[in-house]
């Protein structure tokens, strides 16, 4: 049996009781290490679970999954995912491949940012389509996701923005030369996401288009949701460029405009103090 087990968002103890029981009896336990990260390292997980973990990076999962499936038809193999197993399409692909190989599977769910984002006080049923914001490069500066933000805003829906994670990525030069040399991990911050969004706003204005959001649009920055030191900050998009939320992982919410009074009251708990605002806001 192949088990896909969600680990939740905080630390080693966020795994469910059912998930922990399965981990402790499996012959092999893989830890997916590229779509998200916990606030604790692999060693802390191993100590709490009482098991050695095999790190599974993007290449292992997407190109060499046969190693994961090996003997899963006659023994139990666990694949651990930060958050919920269905937080990334890669994990659906694992299930499809397992099914084609005749390997039975079971999913053990947990909290993910997709539902835990409600901790900021915005009502989950008022969220529209989720978007991803990636690191821009000198030659690649995608803006297509902004159309989804526009549609959500038109419908009065909030937009959860998942921010880019670069783990075990290769530079273009090393990729072309076939050198397995990897760049240091990078995690997009709320500040970086807000700065890119403001540039998109300026680009729309330069083209004579009315942008879906402005510098004054109310947003919410979230960091390390589910951890003991999670941080939440509510303020304008301009303020998101400078607010200090600390270590990763970060997420950003662009509000849908008209807020429910309860949402407004909840967001007031996380308002950025005037002392943290930059001049001219």
UniProtKB/Swiss-Prot annotation:
Key word Chaperone present: no
Annotated catalysed reactions: 2-[(3S)-amino-3-carboxypropyl]-L-histidyl-[translation elongation factor 2] + 4 S-adenosyl-L-methionine = diphthine methyl ester-[translation elongation factor 2] + 4 S-adenosyl-L-homocysteine + 3 H(+)
Lineage of origin: Eukaryota, Metazoa, Chordata, Craniata, Vertebrata
A GO term, aspect molecular function: diphthine methyl ester synthase activity
Binding-site list for S-adenosyl-L-methionine: 9, 84, 87, 112-113, 163, 225, 250
Protein name (database record): Diphthine methyl ester synthase
Pathway: Protein modification; peptidyl-diphthamide biosynthesis
Protein EC: 2.1.1.314
Keyword S-adenosyl-L-methionine set for record: yes
Keywords: Methyltransferase, Phosphoprotein, S-adenosyl-L-methionine, Transferase
Family membership noted in the UniProt record: Belongs to the diphthine synthase family.
Record's GO cellular component terms: cytosol
């Amino acid at each position: 049996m192949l088990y896909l087990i969600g680990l939740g968002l905080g630390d080693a103890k966020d795994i469910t009781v059912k998930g922990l029981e399965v981990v402790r009896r499996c012959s092999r336990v893989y830890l997916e290490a590229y779509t998200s990260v916990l606030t604790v390292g692999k060693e802390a997980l191993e100590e709490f679970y009482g098991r050695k973990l095999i790190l599974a990076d993007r290449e292992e999962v997407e190109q060499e999954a046969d190693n994961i499936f090996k003997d899963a038809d006659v023994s139990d193999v666990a694949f651990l995912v930060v958050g919920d197993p269905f937080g990334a399409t890669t994990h659906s692909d694992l299930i499809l491949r397992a099914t084609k190989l005749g390997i039975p599977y079971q999913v053990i769910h947990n909290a993910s940012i997709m539902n835990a984002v409600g901790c900021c006080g915005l009502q989950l049923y008022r969220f529209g389509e989720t978007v991803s914001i990636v690191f821009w490069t000198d030659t690649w500066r995608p803006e297509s996701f902004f159309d989804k933000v526009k549609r959500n805003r038109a419908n009065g829906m909030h937009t959860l923005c998942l921010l880019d994670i670069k783990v075990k990525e290769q530079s273009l030069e090393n990729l072309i030369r076939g050198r397995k040399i990897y760049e240091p991990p990078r995690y997009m911050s709320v500040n970086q996401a807000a700065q890119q969004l403001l540039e998109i706003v300026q680009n729309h204005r330069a083209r004579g288009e009315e942008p879906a959001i402005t510098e004054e649009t109310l947003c919410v920055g979230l960091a390390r949701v589910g951890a003991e030191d999670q941080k939440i900050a509510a303020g304008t998009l301009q303020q998101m460029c400078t607010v200090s939320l600390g270590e990763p992982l970060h997420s950003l919410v662009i509000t849908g405009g008209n807020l429910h009074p309860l949402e407004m009251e909840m967001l007031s708990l996380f308002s950025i103090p005037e002392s943290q605002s930059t001049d001219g806001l």
